[in-house]
């Protein structure tokens, strides 16, 4: 099977790095995605911040620390916590293809146990 670097397929960006405890929760607000492995990475819904544009729906989130390599396709705009990366496809991809790559990324989780983070190596990771 042929593999390629994550950065060959996706633009790899660091999220907006917000702290949930500094935000106002709002049941009808914007998803707040963190490094959790639960609920598609969404840990709360928060009030929109006028000075911060939410990250776009259709991107893939990857935890660089915490629950390292927890990877999810985000179906709605969202804000992100610390050590969270988001991947934007370089070419058009269906949601099914994005979900496949979520699985490929998550299958590399074993490489980052015992406190190792994926923050430096994510772009060059072979999938």
Question: What do the PLM-derived regions correspond to, one by one?
Answer:
Residues 1-19, 23-40:
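Non-catalytic DNA-recognition/assembly elements of restriction-modification systems
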Residues 14, 40-41, 108-113:
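Short loop/beta submotifs within extracellular cysteine-rich repeat domains
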Residues 16, 30, 70, 76-77, ...:
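Flexible, active-site-adjacent loop/turn segments at secondary-structure boundaries
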Residues 16, 28-33, 58-60, 83, ...:
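Structural beta-strand/beta-sheet cores of well-ordered domains, especially the beta-sheet scaffolds
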Residues 21-23, 50, 74-75, 115:
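Short, flexible, glycine/charge-rich loop motifs used to bind or transfer phosphoryl groups or to couple energy/partner
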Residues 102-119, 124-127:
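Intrinsic, low-complexity N-terminal interaction/targeting segments
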């Amino acid at each position: 099977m042929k593999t390629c670097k994550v950065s060959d397929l996706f633009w790899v960006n660091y999220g907006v790095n917000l702290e949930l405890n500094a935000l106002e929760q709002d049941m009808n607000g914007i998803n707040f995605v963190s490094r959790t492995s639960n609920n598609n990475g969404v840990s709360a819904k928060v009030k929109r911040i006028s000075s911060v544009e939410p990250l776009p729906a259709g991107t893939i989130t990857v935890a660089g620390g915490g629950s390292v390599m927890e990877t999810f396709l985000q179906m709605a705009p969202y804000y992100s916590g610390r050590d969270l990366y988001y991947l934007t496809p370089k070419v058009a991809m269906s949601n099914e293809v994005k979900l496949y790559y979520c699985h490929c990324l998550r299958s590399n989780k074993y490489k980052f146990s015992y406190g190792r983070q994926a923050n430096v190596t994510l772009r060059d990771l072979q999938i």
